[in-house]
Amino acid sequence: MEVKGQLISSPTFNAPAALFGEAAPQVKSERLRGLLDRQRTLQEALSLKLQELRKVCLQEAELTGQLPPECPLEPGERPQLVRRRPPTARAYPPPHPNQAHHSLCPAEELALEALEREVSVQQQIAAAARRLALAPDLSTEQRRRRRQVQADALRRLHELEEQLRDVRARLGLPVLPLPQPLPLSTGSVITTQGVCLGMRLAQLSQEDVVLHSESSSLSESGASHDNEEPHGCFSLAERPSPPKAWDQLRAVSGGSPERRTPWKPPPSDLYGDLKSRRNSVASPTSPTRSLPRSASSFEGRSVPATPVLTRGAGPQLCKPEGLHSRQWSGSQDSQMGFPRADPASDRASLFVARTRRSNSSEALLVDRAAGGGAGSPPAPLAPSASGPPVCKSSEVLYERPQPTPAFSSRTAGPPDPPRAARPSSAAPASRGAPRLPPVCGDFLLDYSLDRGLPRSGGGTGWGELPPAAEVPGPLSRRDGLLTMLPGPPPVYAADSNSPLLRTKDPHTRATRTKPCGLPPEAAEGPEVHPNPLLWMPPPTRIPSAGERSGHKNLALEGLRDWYIRNSGLAAGPQRRPVLPSVGPPHPPFLHARCYEVGQALYGAPSQAPLPHSRSFTAPPVSGRYGGCFY
């Protein structure tokens, strides 16, 4: 062989042997050995296949009774006789002449098999329901319910058989003959067409009416179904038993009797029971009180009730005394406060803001404003010595008695009600125009205290009494401590670089006034405080109108400075001076200390740093949060 001018020769064959097909003896022997091995392998595989074919033919002969001609036989072997086995219980259907039976898709065959299986299961369920209905020693109610279950099972079986016949007719399969109708528990039969099913159910209903009339307890249970209208072929207008209506039976026929919707009492009974329970719970324990109730409590609803607010004198937070803890937690008075000693304040109008709060969270937000604004934590309840020690109701955990409020600095009319009774987001207002919340928070109060309260024209100093000619005005929480505490100002550590390292004089008593009027001691007279360290003497002076306007100006100025500090846009201290009409402030009694917080907030080091809020160096306020935070 020549490839591109080169002659290629085999190293094992010479040229004459390759041309004439003659090979060396060694090569011939190797080829023969390989062919023999291959022949042996094929014979072994053939013998295995023949054995398998022989077994299959014998199995076919056992089924058909004759040996197929494809059965392998040894040379000289005669076909053996095979005895046919007896046929099994399952009968094979004869081949249908319609070829559509053989052309069914797998999905149709699976659907047909599933429907046939469901029909067979429903037949067993109907038979079991009939046996249960015929069981002896059954009460009237049990027998009635079992008959109802049997009727449902028969109805479902009838529907499944109708579906099966429709499917077989659509697929071109022979329609199965009608099955033997199952007898009802009393001997009457129900055909597949369901002709006498309605009549039989009507007869059962009549029997139930007679049986219910004999039993007083069962006759009461059927009184709530007098309003039902007759459905279908029922002859009676009232059905004393639970769900027996025609449309209800069709609704529960979608599954087996075990999955039926359970019977529930009618809504009228539920609402009547609920109304009676609420009336029994809402009855006042004291015969001298009549608590107003909202309209929603008479309707049996479970929505949060809106309190019925009345116009008149402002209500006060009070709680009944002398009640046992169990009665206290279970009565409507558990949503009020302890009553005061004044009998004039013990009226129904004092409870209007606390009635009917069992389904809402209004009582949880009652004392937030009275405790110091929206951001302050609620104060714990301090029960009186004569009242119950522990209140079980969770709705009054944050309530406490409040003093009689004085005139507010925002109005010039009658005294405002406590903030617990004022309209809020939780309780819609129905009395008068809503009052706006205070403009500033606690930090503005501290800021105004830090800047010092202005004097009036007379130049009243620290701890001095104002002249009697001044017009007395109401006190607000921004009237502060400087006008109430006589004596020298509190002493602080001189070298305190942090507000947390300050000390306070142990002999100095300081507290914060309530947000809505005089302190409890000024309104109710001096009384022993549980903590003597928090006691504060009654005020010795009343600020004038000019001072109160100065407080507002200081608060607005503090709000402006706080905004400038936190916005990071200020280049230096930009404080607006106090209005000249206010008067000069008190001599500074606090260390004016600036806190360096870094050039990231106040700019380059060359600029004058903007002082931090000096509200941290205000007098210690321990009346609300406790002295541990200061």
UniProtKB/Swiss-Prot annotation:
Disulfide bonds: none annotated. Residues 326-335 have a biased composition (Polar residues). Residues 109-173 form a coiled coil. It is found in: Cytoplasm, Cytoskeleton, Microtubule organizing center, Centrosome, Centriole; Cytoplasm; Cell projection, Neuron projection; Cell projection, Growth cone. One of its GO terms (cellular component) is centriolar subdistal appendage. Pfam families: CUPID. Ubiquitinated; interaction with CYTH2 may prevent ubiquitination. Residues 31-70 are annotated as: Involved in CYTH2-binding. Residues 212-435, 457-534 are annotated as: Disordered. Residues 212-222, 282-297, 421-434 have a biased composition (Low complexity). GO terms for biological process: microtubule anchoring at centrosome; protein localization. InterPro entries: CCDC120/INAVA (IPR043447), CUPID (IPR021774). It comes from the Eukaryota. The modification Phosphoserine is found at residues 358, 360. Keywords: Cell projection, Coiled coil, Cytoplasm, Cytoskeleton, Developmental protein, Endosome, Methylation, Phosphoprotein, Ubl conjugation. The modification Omega-N-methylarginine is found at residue 435. Centriolar protein required for centriole subdistal appendage assembly and microtubule anchoring in interphase cells. Together with CCDC68, cooperate with subdistal appendage components ODF2, NIN and CEP170 for hierarchical subdistal appendage assembly. Recruits NIN and CEP170 to centrosomes. Also required for neurite growth. Localizes CYTH2 to vesicles to allow its transport along neurites, and subsequent ARF6 activation and neurite growth. Interacts with NIN and CEP170; leading to recruit them to centrosomes. Directly interacts with CYTH2; this interaction stabilizes CCDC120, possibly by preventing ubiquitination. This is Coiled-coil domain-containing protein 120. It comes from Homo sapiens.
